[in-house]
């Protein structure tokens, strides 16, 4: 059954490629024009939301714990900080628009009203790039330096780290685990509890990081778009078989290197062209023995796109233009290496 679904999905993409501009399709898959793949993004968002909730809840448990009765000033400051985090959570994540359409954890997005989907799309990037999520990611980055100690709940971490303060939360040194742990007021049970809180805080922060790192894209859909578009275009450009074969045979590089491509995509401020740029770069680097004939065929394909755009009196997207220039530059470099 799963195989049939994938075949039908590819047939749908093949049909769609015939009727849409390939770059527009790419933008839709990548989500750069406000379109997002809900079947991929919604589960990702739920994981982020749950992990953010767990992070704040862990701090809330610490704030209410009996051990904090020994640190009255710290408790008050932590209470105020947790209140601010909950307020931010309510503002960014307490939206049940799609959740109420879930049945046993699954959503048929065809049954969700369009205005609900549009609202989620508009807020999605704002939510995952919010100050709250950024704070937790920075917290994760700090704690990850002491990964082995925290996972083992080893208090030695509070000895080897420099200074008098060990605060896993950026700009909130009032939560000083060294101060809490080393107090003479604590029993061994209290000390174990403090290390457990640090562990849970790290697990929640890791949960946010791991969820954020999940691509918003179905890589298989992206592969199918590339293959289907090549299949359509090569019928219109004769005597470029070798170049098209090279593109088709190199699609495996997309899946192999996709995590790196996606990291570059996020780091570029969600510029979708960066994925294609890096992909083409890898094709050229993987093709050091490319012949002048294949190089000429690549140039013919590029010229076809230029002529097609000019014929339709369309303005070339600056990102697409940069992509074309990147390919041409790479071909020039390969040509020079041959001479």
From Swiss-Prot:
Induction: Expressed in the late phase of the viral replicative cycle. The keyword ATP-binding does not apply. GO terms for cellular component: host cell cytoplasm; host cell nucleus; virion component. Keywords: Host cytoplasm, Host nucleus, Host-virus interaction, Late protein, Virion. It is found in: Host cytoplasm; Host nucleus; Virion. Coiled coil: none annotated. Belongs to the asfivirus H339R family. Interacts with NACA (alpha chain of nascent polypeptide-associated complex). This is Protein H339R. It comes from African swine fever virus (isolate Warthog/Namibia/Wart80/1980). The lineage of its organism: Viruses, Varidnaviria, Bamfordvirae, Nucleocytoviricota, Pokkesviricetes.
């Amino acid at each position: 059954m799963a195989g049939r679904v994938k075949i039908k999905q590819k047939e749908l993409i093949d049909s769609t490629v015939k009727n849409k501009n390939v770059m527009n399709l790419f933008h839709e898959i990548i989500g750069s024009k406000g379109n997002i793949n809900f079947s991929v993004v919604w589960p990702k968002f739920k994981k982020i939301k749950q992990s953010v909730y767990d992070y704040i809840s862990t701090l809330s448990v610490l704030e209410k714990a009996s051990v904090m009765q020994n640190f009255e000033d710290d408790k008050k400051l932590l209470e105020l900080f947790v209140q601010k985090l909950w307020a931010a959570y309510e503002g960014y994540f307490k939206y049940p628009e799609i959740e109420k359409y879930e049945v046993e954890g699954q959503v048929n997005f065809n049954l969700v009203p369009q205005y609900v989907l549009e609202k989620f799309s508009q807020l999605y990037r704002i939510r995952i790039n919010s100050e709250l999520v950024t704070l937790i990611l920075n917290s994760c980055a700090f704690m990850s330096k002491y990964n082995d100690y925290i996972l083992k709940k080893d208090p030695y971490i509070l000895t080897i780290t420099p200074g008098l303060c060990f605060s896993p939360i950026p700009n909130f040194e009032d939560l000083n685990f060294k101060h809490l742990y080393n107090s003479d007021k604590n029993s061994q049970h209290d000390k174990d509890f403090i290390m457990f809180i640090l562990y849970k805080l790290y697990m929640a922060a890791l949960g946010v990081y791991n969820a954020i790192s999940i691509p918003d894209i179905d890589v298989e859909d992206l592969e199918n778009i590339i293959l289907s578009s090549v299949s359509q275009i090569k019928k219109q450009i004769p005597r470029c078989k070798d170049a098209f074969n090279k593109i088709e045979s190199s699609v495996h590089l997309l899946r192999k290197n996709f995590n790196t491509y996606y990291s570059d995509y996020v780091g570029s401020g969600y510029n979708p062209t960066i994925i294609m740029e890096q992909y083409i770069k890898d094709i050229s680097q993987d093709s050091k023995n490319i012949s002048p004939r294949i190089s000429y065929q690549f140039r013919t394909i590029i010229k076809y796109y230029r002529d097609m755009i000019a014929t339709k009196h369309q303005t070339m997207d600056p990102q697409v233009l940069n992509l074309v220039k990147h390919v041409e530059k790479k071909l020039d470099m390969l040509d020079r290496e041959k001479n």
